[in-house]
Amino acid sequence: MIIFRRCVFINHRDFQVNEQIRDKEVRLIDQDGKQIGIMSAKEAYKIAQERHLDLVKIVPNANPPVCKLMDFGKYRYELSKREKEAKKKQKIINVKEIRMSPNIEDHDFGVKLKSAIKFLKDGDKVKVTIRFRGREAAHTSLAEDLLKRFAEELREYGNVEKAPSMDGRNMMMVIAPKKQ
């Protein structure tokens, strides 16, 4: 009699497979999803060997634990494919920072505004920071007005996610792109 043993590498989910299942009794489900019944783990493992499949504990917290007959390598491959597919669907949002001083000139303000519009059109968030140096920190109201003006100019491209607030010697505001 030839016994086929599968070399199984456990991935980060820590599934218990084949001989690793130490429970006295398990509820066994076959590869089609039909319940075979409650039996000892050794009997379930023998059935798995006869069918050239793996015995995988899928619900360890149940009483008795639920085990399923399956090709574990194929199952892991399908899981990794699903994870990759989910990663592809995720949208990565970057936060771009624009720094200004409280006494910025109009032309410089326009240049910063154009770059913020470009970032918002690309789908990135924009963090607008005004850095205070020396005595400038006494005039926070000027910086707040400047940030409100900046937000007003960007109204059609994005919404203010975080209102202007002081953070140490900086005043900052976050603008998120509008959803289409």
Swiss-Prot record:
PANTHER family (UniProt xref): TRANSLATION INITIATION FACTOR IF-3 (PTHR10938), TRANSLATION INITIATION FACTOR IF-3, MITOCHONDRIAL (PTHR10938:SF0)
PROSITE patterns named in the record: IF3
GO terms assigned for molecular function: ribosome binding; translation initiation factor activity
GO annotation, cellular component aspect: cytosol; membrane
Subunit: Monomer.
UniProt lineage: Bacteria, Bacillati, Bacillota, Clostridia, Thermoanaerobacterales
Entry keywords, A to Z: Cytoplasm, Initiation factor, Protein biosynthesis
Record SUPFAM superfamilies: Translation initiation factor IF3, C-terminal domain (SSF55200), Translation initiation factor IF3, N-terminal domain (SSF54364)
Keyword Protein biosynthesis attributed: yes
Superkingdom assignment: Bacteria
Protein name: Translation initiation factor IF-3
Function summary: IF-3 binds to the 30S ribosomal subunit and shifts the equilibrium between 70S ribosomes and their 50S and 30S subunits in favor of the free subunits, thus enhancing the availability of 30S subunits on which protein synthesis initiation begins.
InterPro entries noted in UniProt: T_IF-3_C_sf (IPR036788), T_IF-3_N_sf (IPR036787), Translation_initiation_fac3_CS (IPR019813), Translation_initiation_fac_3 (IPR001288), Translation_initiation_fac_3_C (IPR019815), Translation_initiation_fac_3_N (IPR019814)
Protein localization: Cytoplasm
Organism of provenance: Caldanaerobacter subterraneus subsp. tengcongensis (strain DSM 15242 / JCM 11007 / NBRC 100824 / MB4)
GO biological process: ribosome disassembly
Family (UniProt): Belongs to the IF-3 family.
Pfam family for this entry, one: IF3_N
